[in-house]
């Protein structure tokens, strides 16, 4: 389901194809408020990678403020809930994650933090914010995610 929504949003941004799914329509209305600003450039479905790290991923939306040169990462999520704490206090199972609550909020924060780390280190792109845009039937709920840079570096170091 999420893949269809992503595709509809991408097609709307790239060529103006009207979305059909209710969550895609709500997302298009929300993102449209930003796209219409003359100083904002929007890039959907941006692939980032690092040969050195052997890692690649796809950023749902990368926005650039042409005045400041800063970027914002946006990741669409169709989850009903984004829990900020884990069930029964469960933590990560590796030594690098054993202090991090095992919950969707942290999973998403780590995902966006990895993308941000790759953009900043390997592409020289300055990221100002990273957001999860949670798609509801009637609105988009935004979650400003922390940059977990130290955790990402620790995890990446454990693989090398």
Residue ranges and their predicted role:
Residues 1-58, 64:
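Metal-dependent nuclease catalytic cores that hydrolyze phosphodiester bonds in DNA/RNA
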Residues 6, 59-65, 69-85, 89-95, ...:
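Conserved catalytic cores of phosphodiester-cleaving nucleases, focusing on short active-site segments
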Residues 51-52, 94-98:
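Gram-negative outer-membrane beta-barrel domains
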Residues 54-56, 69-71, 140-142:
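Short, mixed charged/polar active-site loops
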């Amino acid at each position: 389901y999420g893949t269809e929504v992503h595709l509809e949003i991408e097609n709307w941004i790239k060529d103006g194809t009207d979305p059909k799914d209710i969550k895609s329509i709500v997302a298009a209305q929300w993102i449209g408020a930003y796209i219409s600003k003359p100083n904002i450039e929007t890039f959907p479905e941006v692939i980032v990678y690092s040969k050195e790290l052997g890692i690649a991923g796809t950023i749902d939306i990368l926005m650039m403020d042409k005045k400041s040169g800063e970027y914002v990462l946006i990741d669409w999520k169709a989850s009903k809930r984004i829990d900020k704490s884990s069930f029964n206090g469960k933590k990560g199972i590796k030594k690098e994650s054993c202090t991090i609550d095992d919950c969707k909020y942290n999973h998403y924060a780590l995902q966006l933090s990895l993308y941000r780390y790759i953009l900043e280190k390997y592409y020289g792109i300055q990221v100002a914010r990273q957001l999860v845009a949670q798609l509801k039937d009637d609105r988009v709920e935004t979650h400003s995610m922390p940059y977990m840079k130290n955790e990402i570096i620790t995890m990446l170091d454990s693989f090398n």
